[in-house]
Each structure stands twice: as C-alpha cells, then as structure tokens.
Amino acid sequence: MSKNHEVYKDALPISLAYPLPPIILTNPLTWIPYIYRYLFRKTPRQVQWQCQLHESDLSCVVTDSEAIKKFWTSGFFGKGNLSRSEPTWHTRTKRSLGLLGFDEDLVAEEVTARRRFQRKQFKAQRAYRENRARERQLLLENGKPIPASLEEDAELPEYLTKSLKDFSRVSENPYHITSVPNVEHLQLTFPEAFFLASLGVLRINYENPNFELLPILKLFANIVANSVALTHDYSLQQSHEDPIIEPDNKFLTELAAYFYFRQQGWVVKNGTKFSVDFLLYKKGPVFSHAEFAILLIPCVGNKQKYNMQWHEVHCLNRVIAQVKKSLILCYVQCPSIEDFNKIWKNQASMNEWDWAESVLRQYLIRCVTLRRWVPSRNRD
C-alpha cells in the first residue's frame, strides 16, 4: 500500500470498529490478542469536533488542528483559507523561513511546482540541443569547422543545468524567527458542514444564541435566503423575520445534490474555479484530477427560474473540455410549493434529523452528460 493510500484510507471521519491486530499463523502467541480483540470488540467512541458559523462568507470554520487533519484525510472535506485546497500554509511558510529542509515534508503544491520546473527545464534543454544540431548541420554543409561549443558532447550552459534548489535559496531571516504559529483554518461549505453534522462528528457553534433554537437545515436555508450576495436585496439583510423559503432554495438544491453524489461514492468539492457548482473526484484531489464537473439546474414542476442559452452552455462546455473533464447537467427536481410547505411547516412535530431527511427525500436528481463534438475525433 502506498503512502497516500495509507494516509487517506478512510472515506469518512467516523470510526466503525478498532482494527484487529496482525496475526502470524506460524506464531501462536499472536493468536491470543487477535482472538481477544475479535471476541471482546468495543465500539470506538466518536469524537465530535467543533466549528464556528460564519454568516458573511456562508461557511463554517474549523480551527482545531486535529479536526482539520481528520476532515481532510478522511473524505477531503473543506479547504484551507490560505491554501488552494489542502491546508499547507504552515509547512510552506516554515520552509520559506528556512525552518524546514528543502526536501522535508513536501506538500502537494510544492511537488507540483517541482514537476513543472523539471518539465520546463527539460523542454529548454531539448530546444537548446536542437538549435545546436541545426547550427552544426549548416556548418557541415558549408564545409566550415565545428567549434567545440557545438560538439554533440559539449556541456550545457550553467543556466540550463541548475536545479530548483539553486533557484530556491532561503531568504535571510532578519528577525530570527524560530517558530511560526499556524493561523490557517479549514473552511467548510454549508453542505459539507450539514453532512458532517448529520454523521455526528461536527458540532456547529453560533454567535447568535437565537440560532440554537433552529434546526441546522432551516438555519442554513434562512441564511442563504437572506444572503445579499445571492439575493441582491439589501433590505433582507436588515430583516429579523424568517425569510420565505422556496423549494429551489440554493442551499437545499446543493445539499440534495451533495448527498446524492456522496452516496454514490464520489468526493465532492466546490467547482467555482471552473464556473460550475461541484467537481467529482473518484478518490480525492490527492490521487487524480476531477473527472466530472456538475452544473446544478433547479426545476420546480416544469419550470426553471433561469434557462441557460445555448451559447452559454457551449462556452462552459468548452472550458470544461479544455481541462479534460466531462460536463454533467444535474437537474434537481424540486417538490411543488404546496408539498414543500406542508413538510417544511411540520418541523416542530418531528426530530431534527428525521425532518431533514423527509425534506431531502422530496428532491429528485437527474443527470445528463454533455460532451463537445469534435469532428476529428468523432468520425465514426
């Protein structure tokens, strides 16, 4: 088993059972702890981590280092606020100050940067040799002598043989910093936070004590409905009354799709970088690039609030095709307003999670794969 498969072996941050100790058939002494652990197994105690709700950026913040590591290595939940994906700011900062060795505890961004540098250097060396070969051929055709610098076994210039380490000299540390506090935190989207809370591994803390009285599903839907960034109605921001929650509420449609793809075994990440709602990874960002880009299209009955024009679909599909992904149009069929209001107002008579399940069961997911037709590749 490779190192990555060992570190990221858990699909979810929950412990179902303690692993059995190793057993050697030729050594009877190893049978005793194995049999004891097998017969007297105990259910592991689930740890409930804490996070803080941030209404302004529609996210939940996790600051505990153990929780950050657990959520990332067991399902790739959230992203570092100072990193592209995995929270690696602390390691990168320590290396830039000379507190870590050049090859010590490499993170994904650094490995990627080194591979890009090696490819760039290889192409530069290849182009240099090709130019020298052409010059050598011209001299031979004109009957002129070939200088030593154009010989096939001539050494490459110094700037083409330098390694990344030569260009990555650690700058001086004028303040003699010996330790760097980790100020990075993990940001969870509302669907991720709700999913983890439903598993019982996350507790959401609120600055507003009134939020404690609301179920998480209703609270997140209210916050999204009141969001100025989504509604562009600044008067709602000042309202203290519960907003009108519609079946195609952005949080509810995203949550229904998030649960659907998580149940299919996909690792679901935010897709804002590629102008879509979600990206689907087979195992996770550490192992491979995303295979599919998901664009959510909420539908209430036979109507859609926003119909994309064909030129918009083609532009988006071309962008997705350029990054070697497949675009999936995910139609989220929402319940009718009457059916939705009937279940939504039934919250007081049900358990929080049973009520949330009854709400999500009203949503139906249909996926359509859209691929760009290329004549040179689709002749048959």
Swiss-Prot record:
Gene3D superfamilies: 3.40.1350.10. It comes from the Eukaryota. The active site is at Y281, H289, K325. GO terms for molecular function: lyase activity; nucleic acid binding; tRNA-intron endonuclease activity. The keyword Phosphoprotein does not apply. Constitutes one of the two catalytic subunit of the tRNA-splicing endonuclease complex, a complex responsible for identification and cleavage of the splice sites in pre-tRNA. It cleaves pre-tRNA at the 5'- and 3'-splice sites to release the intron. The products are an intron and two tRNA half-molecules bearing 2',3'-cyclic phosphate and 5'-OH termini. There are no conserved sequences at the splice sites, but the intron is invariably located at the same site in the gene, placing the splice sites an invariant distance from the constant structural features of the tRNA body. This is Probable tRNA-splicing endonuclease subunit sen2. It comes from Schizosaccharomyces pombe (strain 972 / ATCC 24843). The lineage of its organism: Eukaryota, Fungi, Dikarya, Ascomycota, Taphrinomycotina.
